[in-house]
Every structure is written in structure tokens, then in C-alpha cells.
Amino acid sequence: MSNPYISPFAKPVYVMLKPVGSVCNLACEYCYYLEKGKLYPEVKNHIMSEQLLEKFIKEYLECQTMPQVLFTWHGGETLMRPISFYKKALELQRRYGRGRQIDNCIQTNGTLLNDDWCRFFKENNFLVGVSIDGPQEIHDEYRRNKQGLPSFYKVMKGIELMKKHGVEYNAMAVVNDYNVDYPLEFYHFFKEIDCHYIQFTPIVERLGFHQDGTLLTSPEQQDANIKLAPFTVDAGKWGDFLCAVFDEWLKEDVGNYYIQLFDSTLANWVGEQPGVCTLARTCGHAGVMEFNGDVYACDHFVFPEYKLGNIHTQTLTEMMYSQRQLKFGADKYETLPTQCKECDYLFACNGECPKNRFLHTANGEPGLNYLCRGYKKFFKHVAPYMDFMKKELLAERPPANVMQWAKENKL
């Protein structure tokens, strides 16, 4: 696959798979998915059966209308299913694919990678997303195993094995309350390990208490007892972080190192699809299927109230095109407060992820994004550079010309 940022938006149905549910060999303190196992207290083994795997693959392929189909394997920790499981998946993809081009992306924490896994990924053209939050002292702040032991060196061993076997991979980094203070150390680390494709996600979670034992809350839940999780990134610092990394990237890395958020911002600047749901006008394009066939509206909305149904009783098309799911997607724009709809940067952020929209505006309207302050700071900072790159693209010139332009104008 030549492009590591494959956008699902052109496809009629896109559903991520959770072959082991929330089961993981790590216990990262900020993980939003680890507690989802509590939604299924009656089930001992949260493992997707091969029968369900076949049902999903057959139905998923039958409902596609495009010649290219993307499968995304997500966790929990995906490599806790054996290679034989994924070999079976490839066999089923070939059986039901009817000649389509099928791509596979898999997300992993990297600690279980070995030569066998890397050979398998290389031979079958998997794109691997590996979770790593920066250099050792930053990464190990939150990414530890169930015994509290650090994971950095195991992840780095996995990355070295992927390089050895020529596996295409990108880095998935979480920006939290700790590493947000070290933007340049964070960015330089990825350059030092020669990782050219980087996705970073700000962590924003709120903690409450629910009868099923879960702590994380959906944005609709408003209660005096709900508090921001201590690892949540500060909104203003998030903006400072983005500006600092952007300025460093602008010096010599445009066109060589690809940072998804910067690419998506530029796409919105020129009126194209951003390639990520958070910055798109609507969402609801990307559902998720749990180990038992339950389908939810989104990976970040795996709450009982956002369950669409189960593949054993409803088709994927019925669930993903249900009025409920269509409303979920349309509400991303429709429920924005007036402050957002009148904002100069609405086109760039589109309110960002609905899960982060739990604040009220100065006028008391609900639905303001917690990260608004940071994103505004970032968009204002990058506006002249985005304007220039937009002009270059429209003139069919490389946007990397912005580096020389910035130097000449001493920006």
C-alpha cells in the first residue's frame, strides 16, 4: 500500500474489527478501551470465533460497491490472536472478495512482534500501526504492563524487527498531560527512529461511575461528580504542542515526514476530505464490531446507548445506514453551538470529535469542544502556511515549497 492514510469515507460501509475485544497484555493508564470488557461480564473469553469472522468477512465484502476494500484490525491487543487466525481471515477475504483489491491495517502495541509476525505482515502487505508515545522516559510514563513494568524496549525491539523485514508501519502516539510539555523531544524521537508517518491523538477522558463498573463517560453525561481524568491533555498546551511541532516540521521535513493532523488540516484548507473523521463535517462512517458481533457507532462511543445491534440479527448495512447511525453522523455538525458555526475555523476543525464536546459556550450553549482553545491557537498559527500550500497545490506545485517561502519571508 503506497498511502498509509487510507480513507474509509469513499466506502459505503466501514467497520473496524475487535478480534479480542478489549483484552490486552498491557494496562496503559489512559487506555479508553481497556474497561470495555466490563460490558460483557457474563463472557469469560473475549475472543472472536472463526465462524463469526467468516460471517463478517462475507457480509462486509458483499455490501461493498468500491473495487478497493479496507479491513482494520483493532484492539485490545490484536496480536493476542495467533497468526493462524489472520491467515484464515486472508483466506476468507480471497474466497469472498470477487477479485477486489483488499488492504489490511492492524493496530498493535508492538510488544508481541517477532520475526514470524513481521514475515507474515510483509508477505501479505499489512500496514501496521504501532503505539509509541515518544522516547523511553515519556513512553513509559503511562504505557506499562499489568505488573507495572515499562514497555518501551519491547516496542522498540518490535519496530526494529519491522524495519528488518521491510514492514510498512506508522506510529500512533497519544499526547497526554505529561508528554505535551516536550513537543520537540517527542518529534525528534520519531525522526531519530526514522519513522516517516506519525499520527498523534490528544487524550481527553472524563471519569464518573456507572453501575456496570465502568468509569469513562460519554459527552451527553453531565454530572457534578464527573471529573476530567488526570492524564487528560490541557487544551491550551495542546495548541502550543501542535504549533511547536509544526514549526520544527516546517524547517526541513515537509514532504519527507508526514504528520496526519497537518495533512488533514491542509486537506480541509483546500476543500478536500480530511481523511480522518475527527476533522470531517460528518462522522458515523466508521463503526466497530466487538468480539461477539455487537456493532457500535464508533470506536470512541462503545457505550450501551450507542450499540447499533448485532451482526447475528441485523446486517452491517442495516446497522450502519440506520436512521440512528445517520443521525449520529449528521449531529456532528447539526448540534454545534452558534459559537462554532460562526467561527472562522469551522471549515478546518468541524467541531472535532463529538466525544470531546462536553463544555458550554459563554452563552450557555452545550456542545463546545474541550480542545477548542488549543485548536484555535494552532489554526491561527498555521494559517499563512496553509494558505501558501493551498496556492501551490492549486498551481500543481509541491506544497513542500512552503519551507523555502517561510525562510525567505522570515516567518
List each language-model region with its residue ranges:
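Flexible mid-to-C-terminal extensions adjoining Fe-S/redox cofactors in radical SAM and related proteins
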Residues: 302-411
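Short, acidic, Ser/Thr-enriched surface-loop or helix-capping motifs
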Residues: 290
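Conserved alpha-helical substructure of the radical SAM core
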Residues: 1-119, 123-124
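Conserved AdoMet/S-adenosylmethionine-binding subsite of the radical SAM
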Residues: 58, 80-199, 206-208, 212
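Disulfide-bonded cysteines in secreted/extracellular proteins and peptides
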Residues: 24, 28-31, 277, 283, ...
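Radical SAM enzyme [4Fe-4S]-AdoMet core and its adjacent flexible, acidic
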Residues: 145-153, 160, 164-278, 282, ...
